[in-house]
Amino acid sequence: MSRARTNKENRPKRPSTLGLLLGGTGGRKDASKGAEAERQRRRRERDRSREMAAYVGYDAMYRDGIAQVMPGMFSQTVEFSDISYQSARKEARETAFTVMSSLFNYFPADSHVQLQVVNAPIPADEVGRKVFFEPGERATAGLAAEYNRILNDKMREGVSNLVRHRYLTYAVGADDVDAAVPKLARIRGDVEQTLARIRCSSRALDGAERLELLQGQLRPGSRFEFSWDKLSPTSGARTKDFVMPSTLDFKPEGRSDCFRSDGRYGAVLAVRSFGSVIEETYLASIIDLPLPLNVTLHVQPIAQSEALALVKRQIDWMDKEIIDEQMSAVKKGYDYQILPPELRFSKEEAEELLDFLRNKSERLFVYTGLVYTWADSLEELDRRVQQVTSVAQGCTIGLEPLHFRQRQALNSVPPLGDNHVTVSRYLTTGQVAMQMPFASQSLDEAGGGYYGQSKESGNLVLCDRKRLASPMGFVCGKPGSGKSFSVKREITNTVLAHPEDEVVIFDPAGEYGNLVGALGGANVELAPGCSAVLNPLDTADVADRADAAKLAYKTDAVLALSSALMAEGREGLPERDRSIIARCVGEAYRECAKDGRLPTLGDFHAALLAQPEPEAADIALRYERYVKGAFSFFNGQSNVALDNRITNIDMHGLGQNMRVFGMITALEMVRNRVMVTPPRPNYTWLYIDEVQSLFAHPTVVEYFARLWREGRKFGLICTGISQNTSHMLANAEARDMVLNSEFFLLHKQSTADLDAWAEMLQLSATERGYIGDAVKPGEGLLISAGIRVPITDDFPKGPLYDLWNTKPAEVAEREMRRAAREAEE
């Protein structure tokens, strides 16, 4: 066995000790030697069986997912999710290593553990025919069809035609299934709690799910058609009848290194050797191959007392070897202190291993590593085997075919918790835990929108923000980074994926009008001379709320408006001004209620002028231009409603100071719309471009943060869009909003913004590189709760590209072509 070590100081450095000193696993003395011998006998009988049902490696499968592997042995399978490991910070990776170490150390010596990562291909008849977005309304049917075509084409570029799953199967001894249930339940609970420490969700598979997984390994490519209703005392059918192949040939065309199952060819390879360093990425390198794969690690814990005795025996043996070498040297006249380097090195390793077992919470395991792949032809199988072995060799892992042992190997790869292959070695806890099952993280949520392709694997990145506990989020990037393209794409995603929801856009630059028009939405322009009127004191949509609640909300809104009007607003409103404003808001509502109407800014302005304090006159003077003259479109009863499913509020005609005033007024309209009792069944998606402008005034920030915090409870999903975030993140309220959000789409950042995001989101050096100055437009980092995926995007030109594109040269060229076509007509 080659010398191998892990690259962490607190981990065993040279697992080669195990190979050099311990050799194979035949010397192990088990306390339950009789039981193990009986299990080995049954395994041999199963492997030799010529009857298919007797060959398949379990006796019974129960509805709850517990399998009787053989008499006295029962197993259960837990599926667990991926985590951002490969690009995570050093501290996060070390935490994951510690958790995986504690997970393996948890299992007792009488159990068996099987860790698997499976790349399962989607059915062939679904490739290229997947429906990502339903046609929906007539206005969007053509866009949905085009979108589906493009995404189906892109599926073939990565491994999106494969579905990756991770499983942990554990087997225990028990007299019968009733005795096994509490044992397995306790293990399941402890496993789920342990994995949760690294934000890894897990769940136990039920019987039907385990059978489907078994069939996928025994009969690759076949469709699962099992139902418990098909089993009955009269039918005589067994669960095995639905998962086992009709034919198995372990010498296809005279070969001994593969097999044929129902017309498909498969091969199982074994891990024979490790390099001088066990790389934590070696499993990920194999798993990320765009191939159907099953990577299986069988781990059999050894009792600590037995492991210590085993190592001590090997040390005693080496001491004897050293004495023999020294005596021989004396007889031949050599220096007896000069020992063969290999023997001296082995003795040092053995003593180091003994120290790890005694003092550093390490245990010893019998380890078997298997890699299983399959194909429709022998030629394709050979190519896939060559790919796997080449990648493994690049990671200094020796994979070899199991000649004449494919029969045993095929029974060892299904998730049953039973190993029929005798190619094994001893590894310690650290060496097993280093073999991380986490590859390039994928995000493929059914019903989600498209955000690009994984930069690591080429997979489609599909995210459904409605699944998040806090779906609020931010899309940020420098000008030219692809930020606007991403936002327009997400708006299209939302419209197509969630036809029952509403979309509202705050458009300070006037760039979303074409998209909204194409999606069948309404554009509302707020500017001098336009017909649209927004009343910030409107309460029409919250008429059923108590008067005190309505007044409190409107007071907050007017305080925010007043703060935005103040030149010294960055310091906030003085308490005296706050009291005057609150008093006048109440008086405006009371006076107008007598006439049975809602107050306007003019009524509020009149109430200010009637106050005795000189500060009231100053506040009234600030509002005067919004009550009289060209900017008076905020003084009147609202004639703008969110009746259309998609509404774009175009504010590019407003000046910078007035734009914040307009945003707050529009926010009030949205808040009136969503904060109703009981909450509306559908969601409202709010996209706020140039959101950083709302963080210049403390009172405005307080108002916006409250809406951000409370709106989620009423089905409001906010997205802040910004090209300059370092100033925004310097605000304490803004930081709280970021910390309470779970969705971030970050493109290329300036140095200051990059540092701010890295601190807020605890980005690793690798993750910083995904949004650094060297990335191309469209590239970035998508964060959805605990999932972090680097993205890239090369979206083909066409109708959708034209709707989303904001590159000035391409937009100008497109407009010239359109004008030329119109001139010809």
PLM regions and their residue ranges:
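The conserved Walker
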Residues: 467, 479
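Conserved lysine of the Walker
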Residues: 483
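Hydrophobic positions on the alpha1 helix immediately C-terminal to the Walker A/P-loop
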Residues: 486
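Post-Walker A helix-loop "phosphate-sensing" segment adjacent to the P-loop in P-loop NTPases
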Residues: 493-504
